[in-house]
Amino acid sequence: MANHSSAKKVVRQTVKRTLINKKRSSAIKTFIKKVIHEISRGNKEDANLALSIAQSKIMQGVKKNIIKLNTASRKIRRLSKQIKNLYKSE
């Protein structure tokens, strides 16, 4: 346990940052799930709209160091590929 006041402050800051990061991470996952849901329903326009919003949130997560750039790029690429396959299946 922290004894010095500065160490106690660091513990408080860590707890605060952890909660904020979990909230942001959860929001990113929620937007990704919305895209997947629209893809499963077959709504091309709604899926594209959801992807653009999710892509924005994912890149904001990269900027805030919630997820790494390569991970974000991979998630966006895979979602885009699924939407592209919706158009091919016509």
UniProtKB/Swiss-Prot annotation:
One Pfam family recorded for the sequence? Ribosomal_S20p
Q: Which UniProt keywords apply?
A: Ribonucleoprotein, Ribosomal protein, RNA-binding, rRNA-binding
Keyword Acetylation appears in the UniProt entry:
no
Q: What is the residue range of the signal peptide feature?
A: none
Report any one BP term from Gene Ontology.
translation
Molecular function (GO) terms listed?
A: small ribosomal subunit rRNA binding; structural constituent of ribosome
| Keyword tRNA-binding in record | no
The UniProt entry's GO CC annotations, sorted and at most eight, read: small ribosomal subunit
Q: Which SUPFAM superfamilies match?
A: Ribosomal protein S20 (SSF46992)
As for family, the record states: Belongs to the bacterial ribosomal protein bS20 family.
HAMAP family according to UniProt = Ribosomal_bS20 (MF_00500)
Biological role stated in the UniProt entry:
Binds directly to 16S ribosomal RNA.
Q: What is this protein called?
A: Small ribosomal subunit protein bS20
Q: Which organism is it from?
A: Rickettsia prowazekii (strain Madrid E)
